[in-house]
């Protein structure tokens, strides 16, 4: 056993996440799918236009990241009822805090390096610290980059608290339903609150779904309902000027359910499958990397990048993300320092 493999083995034994020993490649595929769809979303936004009509059909991806952040730990926790729940919740809480710290560090670095993004967003260290209240309470996207990291972090922290409740399923479901309903009926919700509701909706779904009926075990009737729900969602956003939190959460659940159950049923050992799996294993880094890479291309002001609906920057970004993920995975398997450094930030 290599040095890195031994350290990883000790880390797995030292945690209460036995699912890490039997990592589901279909979950990684699902997260990789979200990264690729996010590349589509940002490519259209940066190189075609923020109001381009196709963007509405991939807009589920923003909430999808937060939904998955709540769904996966909740599902995996209930699939291991004999585990140490307090330690698992402590790990979720710590990961949420690390995401908040990562968000702060990234925005401070951008404040030092850039004055303005290609889209006109102002950056500055003093501006960031002057606006901590609206940034962390409301989620003002005009003031920061990587704003979605905050509701993802809040989702993990909230679940770390809620999952310790005695009647955990009821508590998570009622909390999620109340928050989604509030965001649907009220106009007073903020960016952070809206996407926190998506994260808790994912947590509720993860607690209510039977893990033994996932993937290839899902009945054909359930798969048909997921596809029908995804179709209804896509048709609805075609005719509605604005969707609502209930429709958005249901649409995310159906679209991600379709992606997961379809891949899980076949699990083809093909290059495209393995590509999405490795992207999913580094989904957070992939999310950050694709934004930075696309912004770099955007700052180049190369007219050819705007041709064919941004196909060229999309392909370049996909190649970059694949190379980054495979390269990092290669290095982590061979160098314990790199592996521990990655885990200290992203795991």
Q: What positions do the PLM features span?
A:
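Alpha-helical transmembrane segments and their immediate juxtamembrane cytosolic regions
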Residues: 2-347
């Amino acid at each position: 056993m290599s040095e890195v493999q031994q350290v990883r083995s000790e880390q797995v034994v030292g945690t209460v996440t036995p699912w890490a020993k039997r990592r589901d490649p279909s979950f990684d595929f699902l997260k990789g799918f979200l990264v690729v769809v996010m590349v589509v979303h940002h490519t259209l936004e940066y190189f075609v236009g923020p109001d381009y009509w196709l963007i509405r059909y991939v807009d589920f991806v923003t909430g999808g990241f937060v939904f998955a952040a709540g769904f996966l730990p909740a599902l995996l926790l209930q699939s291991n009822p004999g585990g140490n729940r307090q330690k698992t919740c402590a790990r979720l809480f710590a990961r949420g805090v690390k995401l908040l710290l990562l968000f702060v560090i990234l925005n401070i670095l951008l404040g030092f390096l850039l004055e303005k993004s290609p889209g006109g967003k102002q950056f500055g260290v003093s501006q960031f610290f002057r606006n901590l209240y609206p940034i962390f309470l409301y989620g003002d996207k005009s003031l920061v980059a990587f704003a979605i990291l905050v509701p993802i972090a809040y989702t993990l922290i909230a679940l770390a608290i809620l999952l310790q409740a005695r009647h955990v399923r009821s508590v998570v479901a009622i909390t999620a339903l109340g928050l989604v309903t509030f965001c649907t009926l009220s106009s007073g919700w903020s960016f952070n609150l809206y996407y926190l509701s998506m994260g808790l909706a994912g947590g509720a779904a993860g607690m209510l779904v039977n893990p033994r009926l996932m993937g290839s075990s899902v009945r054909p009737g359930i798969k048909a309902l997921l596809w029908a729900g995804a179709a209804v969602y896509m048709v609805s956003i075609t005719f509605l000027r604005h969707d609502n939190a209930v429709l958005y959460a249901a649409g995310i659940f159906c679209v991600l359910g379709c992606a997961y159950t379809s891949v899980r049923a076949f699990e083809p050992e093909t290059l495209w499958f393995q590509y999405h799996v490795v992207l999913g294993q580094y989904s957070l880094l992939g999310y950050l990397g694709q934004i930075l890479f696309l912004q770099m291309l955007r700052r180049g002001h190369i007219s050819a990048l705007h041709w064919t609906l941004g196909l060229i920057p999309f392909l370049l970004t996909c190649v970059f993300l694949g190379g980054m993920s495979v390269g990092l995975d290669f290095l982590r398997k061979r160098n314990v320092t790199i592996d521990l450094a990655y885990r200290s930030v992203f795991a």
